[in-house]
Regions:
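Glycine-rich beta-alpha junction loops
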Residues: 14, 62-65, 235-236, 259-266, ...
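Acidic, His- and aromatic-enriched active-site or binding-groove loops in soluble protein domains
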Residues: 177-184, 224-237
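Metallocofactor- and cofactor-centric catalytic cores in central/energy metabolism, strongly enriched
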Residues: 1-204, 214-220, 243-245, 339-398
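Conserved anion/nucleotide-ligand pocket segment
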Residues: 229-231, 235-299
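Glycine- and other small-residue-rich loops at beta-strand/loop junctions that grip anionic moieties
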Residues: 185, 206-209, 231-233, 258, ...
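Short glycine/serine/threonine/alanine-rich loop segments
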Residues: 200-201, 225-226, 252-253
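Glycine-rich, aromatic-lined ligand/substrate-binding cores of catalytic
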Residues: 297-304, 308-365
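An acidic- and aromatic-residue-enriched active-site/binding cleft used to recognize and process polar
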Residues: 13, 156-158, 208-211, 233-234, ...
Length: 398
């Protein structure tokens, strides 16, 4: 549909991943960039009625006071990404979309994230119910003001600490009773998720945070006939693991140990410097080797905050494996990339595919998006090639 208008609502709007995705969308709209690094620009997807850049309107929530222009200029200064002329050319669009961003919430987001908040409105509501109602009011206003056909809520905020789920999360009735009793039983990521899904809007979790990955939220997805997916975008070291581990399995090498050491210095790195937040990230990074090879080698993942690296991250992996006649050998690789540049195109891919699925009337977890995530909801398969085959089969089927 040529005149379709869709909303992309980003949780963590002023962050590096979000701002880079928005700059990319604005540049694409002006024919200032091509489709390099966007999966949905491959010929496989040509026959799908995916949204082009002209269809999108952007908004979001954030707990900090900033703007899309400030965020991309900051990345340009600190990490030497983007061309200054590109930012200037897209500035009017960034300012227009930035006007749609509203104050987020730090309720139950954890101490490390709360320290980042400098917007006083981020701490206004004191119960999950009040926060959910405020988020819903923002989403409804965004949709109405911009005359949007659809709104997708996509979480690209900082990683929350692990959140223990209990009996109140196991069904919608139990969850709603706890919510009405004003209990603080969900983290901020799940408040955004519940708010969106309850309005029938798709919700995607690009972070390791809880989001919609509990039974009551998934029941609500079915009840409201919408879609969800995630978790934790797969952009760097874990992507390499999901590509290399199948090679070891298919060549029948036995992996003895796999050690991955990660260093980076952006705001996400600062949050992950907190041991509680780091635990959430390590859980999603350290699970796939065993699933792919069918046994459990010794594994270790470390994440360290190195301030001077800014948005550039380095992963060094050491793989000790056994070959023919019991001979032990070693493979090492170094992955160096710009965190936001790696993640942003996937945000646009996921947005296009999710909006497409929602328009088709699909309901539930979007399993076909597994190749984009470290911990894909509804999918136990971690082999990247098997995951991508799921996406190929979906595209050919529809």
């Amino acid at each position: 549909m040529k005149n379709r208008r869709v909303g992309l609502w980003l949780i963590g709007a002023w962050g590096g991943v979000s701002a880079t995705a928005v700059l990319g969308l604005a540049a694409w709209k002006r024919n200032l960039t091509d489709g390099t690094s966007m999966v949905t620009m491959l010929p496989l997807f040509d026959a799908l009625d995916l949204d082009g850049p002209d269809a999108f309107v952007v908004g979001g929530h954030d707990i900090r006071q900033s703007s899309f222009v400030d965020a991309v200029q900051d990345l340009h200064r600190r990490s030497n990404v983007f061309d200054a002329s590109l930012i200037d050319a897209c500035k009017p669009q960034l300012e227009e979309w930035g006007a749609n961003v509203r104050p987020g919430t730090i309720l139950n987001a954890g101490a490390a994230i709360a320290k980042l908040a400098d917007n006083p409105e981020a701490n206004l509501a004191d119960t999950p119910r009040a926060v959910i109602e405020r988020i819903q009011a923002d989403l409804q206003k965004f949709k109405a003001d911009n005359k949007l056909d659809q709104v997708l809520v996509l979480n690209v905020s900082s990683t929350e600490p692990p959140f223990a789920i209990g009996e109140s999360h196991q069904s919608m009735p139990k969850f709603l009773r706890a919510l009405e009793a004003r209990q603080n039983m969900i983290p901020a990521s799940s408040m955004y998720a519940w708010a969106a899904i309850d309005l029938g809007m798709p919700y995607i979790n690009f972070t390791p945070s809880l989001g919609a990955s509990f039974v009551a939220a998934l029941e609500l997805v079915q009840e409201r006939k919408t879609v969800t997916g995630g978790k934790d975008g797969k952009t760097g070291e874990t992507l390499m693991k999901s590509v290399l581990a199948p090679m070891f399995a298919l060549r029948n090498f036995r992996i003895l140990s796999w050690v991955g050491h990660n260093i980076f210095g952006n705001r996400d790195g600062l949050v992950l410097d907190d041991p509680a937040n780091k635990e959430s990230k390590i859980r999603t990074k350290d699970q796939l080797i065993q699933q792919i090879v069918g046994y459990k080698p010794q594994t270790h993942v470390s994440i360290e905050y190195i301030e001077s690296l800014d948005d550039w991250k380095t992963a060094w992996d050491h793989i000790h494996f056994q070959g023919f006649l019991g001979t032990k050998m070693i493979m090492q690789f170094i992955w160096q990339g710009c965190d936001s540049i790696l993640a942003a195109p996937l945000v646009l891919d996921i947005a296009r595919l999710t909006l497409f699925a929602h328009r088709r009337g699909e309901v539930g977890v979007l399993r076909q998006l597994a190749c984009f995530f470290k911990s894909p909801m509804g999918v136990e398969e971690h082999d990247f090639f098997e995951q991508f085959r799921m996406l190929e089969e979906y595209v050919r089927a529809v």
